[in-house]
Amino acid sequence: MVKFLSLTSSVTALLLLSLGANGVAAAATTCTVAKSGSDDTAAITKAFSDCKNGGTVVFSKDTTYNLNGILILSDLKNVNIELAGTIKLPGFDKAVKGLKSYIQLIGTNVKVYGGGVINANHSSVSDISIINSPRAHMGVTNATDVLINNITLHTASTSSLRPKNTDALDVSRSSNVVFQNSKLTVGDDCLAINEEVTNVTLSKITCNGGHGFSVGSLGKGGANQHVKTVRIHDSVCNDCQNGVRIKTWPGGKGSVSDIKFNNVELNNVENPILITTHYCDKNQMNYCTNNDKTSLSISDVVISDITGSASNDGNPIVSINCSTSTPCTDFTLSGVKITKASNTPKNVCVNLDGSSKIAECSA
């Protein structure tokens, strides 16, 4: 399932979103969404119902469709969605709070493509872009073979407060996900890989002001969770809170393995390389302290050719802090060339097997 996320009025739009296969599925039936007035929810629902088995749903060019309700479009199979027009979302609606989305597409081999517009929070966005999201922009859940390509996200605060929880992409319970060729301005994770995920590749992404490229958080409340085979490469993070990161909770179970960060440029970043098994919310500190000795196992991690500069927040360039009973293992660091600030302290490697042989741990 791919969620078009919107707690109040954000929505996910993908230049090409693929569930189950590459390319655009062959579709014999075309269902053009009728323009019905101030609320086009029913017309959109009907078009998807009529074309849910091997059809193409068309949002016409130069047409604005008003969505005043929640759309859960299920049982889709081999459906193409041609977004040539504009979808305009409503403002805050309490009914959507529990779902965290205005639009959900549920099915197999569903494609979204075209050069249309989604209007969120009364702001026009084009070329499959999302602006001013009050919550996470995109979510991939219970899906396989997903391609997210050439999108633009821009959510920035108009005050000194950061736009919290505005992740660019959250992935959970999915496999074979590719996110590439995109520009992001967000207030939280540029990528957050959550539980039961295998084979994610992120490349050629520029992220501004976010929390970096993250695996986790994982293991909250003692959960048993797993992430395997993640490739993050040829990307940039500017003015980010974190650069490349793995974060797990104390007391968690499971594993994180086969993770590679390569050729990532981090400019003016607070925590360029941050790996911790001590991630915790402020209101959970007692639990975290009592379960601090164990967490998920983190192994087979390669960090190479990381360049850029550290901010003057006084954090180490490399901070790897693992648990005493579940130390991190099989780490390789090379080509870390981050320019220090005047107050940058020495790097930290705690409970990392083989740290004495890793040059970056003593830098």
Curated annotation (Swiss-Prot):
| GO MF annotation: an example | galacturan 1,4-alpha-galacturonidase activity
Compartments it resides in: Secreted
Annotated glycan sites: 121, 142, 150, 199, 321
The known PTMs are summarized as:
N-glycosylated.
Its predominant location is secreted
pH effect summary: Optimum pH is 4.0.
Cysteine pairs bridged by disulfides in the record: 190-207, 322-328
According to the UniProt record, one GO cellular component term is: extracellular region
Q: Any idea which UniProt keywords this protein has?
A: Cell wall biogenesis/degradation, Disulfide bond, Glycoprotein, Glycosidase, Hydrolase, Repeat, Secreted, Signal
Query: Reaction catalysed by this chain?
Result: [(1->4)-alpha-D-galacturonosyl](n) + H2O = alpha-D-galacturonate + [(1->4)-alpha-D-galacturonosyl](n-1)
Signal peptide range equals 1-26
Active site residues per record: 188 (proton donor), 211
Q: What Pfam families would the database entry show?
A: Glyco_hydro_28
An example of a Gene Ontology BP annotation on this entry? Answer: cell wall organization
- Highest taxon of the lineage: Eukaryota
What EC number(s) does its UniProt record assign?
Answer: 3.2.1.67
Q: How does activity depend on temperature?
A: Optimum temperature is 40 degrees Celsius.
Q: Which parts are the PbH1 repeats?
A: 143-173, 174-195, 197-217, 227-248, 256-277, 328-354
Q: What does this chain do?
A: Specific in hydrolyzing the terminal glycosidic bond of polygalacturonic acid and oligogalacturonates. Has no activity towards trigalacturonic acid.
Q: Which family does it belong to?
A: Belongs to the glycosyl hydrolase 28 family.
Protein name, please?
Exopolygalacturonase rpg13
Give the organism the record lists.
Rhizopus delemar (strain RA 99-880 / ATCC MYA-4621 / FGSC 9543 / NRRL 43880) (Mucormycosis agent)
